[in-house]
């Protein structure tokens, strides 16, 4: 919801307050990677421009989804950051949980331990430590 190109968008990371809950997705929307892949080139550029303008990326870098959104969520001042399992596993839209208003194909995705990548676990632990989210 945040990356529509408006600097006044209330969902941008800099507008998140300490008492807020931030999340990269819910059961009712696409995975972060699926969302990003569905954007037009122009919309993807808006996301990248935001990341560059806020020193998350350098000129010439590319977006790394869902990693970039996960870092923004974890680095936010929100009390709670929620990352769906599909984002933690870097899964695309084929792993979406639910499409509201449809009756077929929903709630089919199941987590499997074989999907866990050791590097993803190390990256997550590093970010949780870096952003003070290990308690």
Language-model-detected regions and their locations in the chain:
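Catalytic cores of glycan-processing enzymes that make or break glycosidic bonds
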Residues: 1-135
């Amino acid at each position: 919801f945040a990356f529509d190109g408006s600097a006044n968008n209330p969902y941008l990371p800099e507008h998140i307050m300490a008492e807020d809950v931030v999340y990269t997705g819910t059961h009712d929307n696409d995975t972060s990677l699926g969302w990003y892949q569905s954007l037009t080139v122009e919309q993807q550029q808006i996301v990248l421009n935001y990341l560059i303008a806020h020193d998350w990326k350098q000129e010439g870098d590319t977006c790394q989804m869902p990693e970039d959104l996960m870092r923004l969520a974890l680095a936010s001042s929100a009390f709670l950051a929620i990352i769906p399992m599909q984002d933690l596993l870097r899964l695309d839209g084929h792993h979406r949980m639910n499409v509201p208003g449809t009756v077929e194909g929903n709630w089919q995705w199941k987590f499997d331990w074989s999907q866990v990548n050791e590097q993803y676990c190390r990256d997550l632990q590093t970010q949780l430590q870096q952003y003070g989210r290990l308690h």
